[in-house]
Swiss-Prot record:
Mg(2+) binds at residues 256, 280. This is Pyruvate kinase. It comes from Agaricus bisporus. Disulfide bonds: none annotated. K(+) binds at residues 65, 67, 99-100. PANTHER family: PYRUVATE KINASE. Coiled coil: none annotated. It is an enzyme of class 2 (transferase).
């Protein structure tokens, strides 16, 4: 791999970093960011105008949180997002993600809706007996997981309300668990329950989740963020529910419990991508260990070339404040340095007072973090862990990234049908943009999951005769260059590496071309395919 200014180590590269020379996003550079931004859409920004604002600030994927809201509300998010996309002059795609509620465990309803204080040392009963489901107090607390008594044991812990209350199990008698409070707190209605170091046997989808997935299929969502995944079989069950009509929807698994971390390898084999969901994960395992789990999962995703998202509390203070804490900015930057493909905003955009500012801050931080990466040793590391021999498409992707470095090319341009070639090029983390052109509109949206990819949907019909093939290829290249120029991703006269197939369809990528971006706009006009 050709060195960056003669530097071939990350530590040496770090010595050259200069805050005075750090790039600041402007109208001409804001699209240079490689890391995608996911924003959760709440009522505050669920209008075409406000969605346009956050998109212009840097959002690539919108997230619908199905733990809240009705189908009618989420339909409005989909409709407003699609209208916003239509209004964009460059037609740049924005993906839509459905985040499932998942198989949560919760306490019951308190008696008369009251809150009940408890003190450290208090002892009471946690029960799965449904007759207590709506009369909970500080003597008997119902939990809606029927198998609780059979999967846990004395000496284990139960966490209530995001870990605010810790309960130690003293003994078990049928459906009743005798527990002791380890700290002061307040018992309220319908609070979340976590069971650390316990193998929970809940199904991956509730009936509500299945209904939500059917809603997503009808509306053509691009990806599912599947909550509380614990084992590889969970992913297979979700695929069965999606069925043929939802086969093209990407399944991004959320790892947010100890089981998911322990079974990560088998889950990764089944999933299309991973979200490091640090909220619940930081309850189930010690908070001090979350960063280790994050680094492990990101590394394993990078090695196999599957997208990975880092989420939860990234700029949490910007929900209410116009500026983030320094620690939050470092958290976003370190997620990028770790190798994440996407970073996510939750309450910051869903209910926050500063949604646009939150996106702008995340976009600027990602852009700066990307400049702190020394790409040659990163490429070498990724090559070193890749088993040989490689498949043809991956061999071409490796060669394209290496050729771009040797040529000092300013972009790679990938023609892709399914997005697989773009994924493979992204896997080797080139320092330059990956302009991706595809005829599949959903593929164009899904490609945002992969770092460095700038997707464009090519709407023109395919040339079906052999003599039309090269003209069709050249037209798609011109289309990609024209759109990339419009967004200042590349400049006229720049050298680029084009990656294409030798014929149409899937699985035929085997060709590299070294091209120069035309300086005359007329050279980017699409050519007629001729008579069929």
């Amino acid at each position: 791999m050709y060195p960056v200014d003669g530097i071939r180590s990350q530590i040496e590269w770090n010595t050259t970093l200069n805050v005075s020379d750090a790039p600041v996003p402007t109208e001409t550079t804001k699209y240079h960011r490689k890391t995608a931004i996911i924003a959760t859409i709440g009522p505050k920004i669920n209008t075409v105008e406000k969605l346009t604002d956050v998109r212009l600030a840097g959002v690539n994927i919108v997230r619908m949180n199905f733990s809240h809201g009705t189908h009618e509300y989420h339909q409005s998010v989909i409709d407003n997002t699609r209208q916003m996309i239509k209004n964009d002059p460059h037609g740049r795609p924005v993906a839509i993600a459905l985040d499932t509620k998942g198989p949560e465990i919760r306490t019951g309803q308190t008696r008369d809706g009251n809150d009940y204080p408890i003190k450290a040392g208090d002892e009471f009963i946690v029960t799965t007996d449904p007759k207590y489901s709506d009369i909970c107090d500080n003597k008997v607390l119902f939990v809606d997981y029927a198998n609780l008594a059979s999967v846990t044991a004395p000496g284990k812990l139960i966490y209530i309300d995001d870990g605010i209350i810790s309960l130690l199990i003293l003994s078990i008698d049928g459906m009743n668990l005798h527990v002791r409070a380890l700290n002061n707190g307040t018992l309220s209605s319908r609070k979340g329950v976590n069971l650390p170091k316990t193998d929970v046997d809940l199904p991956p989808l509730s009936e509500k989740d299945k209904d939500d997935l059917r809603f997503g299929i009808r509306n053509g969502v691009d990806m599912i963020f599947a909550s509380f995944i614990r084992r590889g079989e969970d992913v297979r069950q979700i695929r069965e529910v999606l069925g043929p009509d939802g086969a093209s929807i990407k399944i991004i698994v959320k790892i947010e419990n100890e089981q998911g971390v322990a079974n990560f390898d088998e889950i990764l084999k089944e999933a299309d991508g991973v979200m490091v969901a640090r909220g619940d994960l930081g309850i189930e395992i010690p908070a001090s260990q979350v960063f280790l789990a994050q680094k492990m999962m990101i590394a394993k995703c990078n090695i196999v070339g599957k997208p990975v998202i880092v989420a939860t509390q990234m700029l949490e203070s910007m929900t209410y404040n116009p500026r983030p804490t320094r620690a939050e900015v470092s958290d976003v930057a370190n997620a990028v340095l770790d190798g994440s493909d996407c970073v996510m905003l939750s309450g910051e955009t869903a209910k926050g007072s500063y949604p646009v500012q939150s996106v702008l801050m995340m976009a600027e931080t990602c852009l700066l973090a990307e400049t702190a990466i020394c790409y040659p040793p990163l490429y070498d590391d990724l090559r070193a862990v890749q088993a040989r021999p490689t498949e043809t498409a991956e061999t071409v992707a490796i060669a394209a990234v290496a050729a771009a470095a040797e040529q000092d090319a300013k972009a790679l341009l990938v023609l892709s049908t399914s997005g697989e070639t773009a994924r493979l090029v992204s896997k080797y983390r080139p320092k330059i943009p990956i302009i991706t052109v595809t005829r599949n509109e959903q593929t164009a949206r899904q490609i945002h999951l992969h770092r460095g990819c700038y997707p464009f949907w090519y709407p023109e019909p395919r040339g079906v005769q052999n003599h039309q093939w090269q003209t069709d290829v050249d037209n798609r290249i011109r289309f990609g260059l024209r759109n990339a120029l419009a967004l200042n991703v590349i400049q006229p006269g720049a050298s680029i590496i084009a990656v294409q197939g030798w014929k149409g369809g899937l699985g035929h990528t085997n060709t590299l071309r070294i091209l120069t971006v035309p300086t005359d706009p007329a050279d980017l006009e699409l050519q007629p395919l001729g008579s069929l």
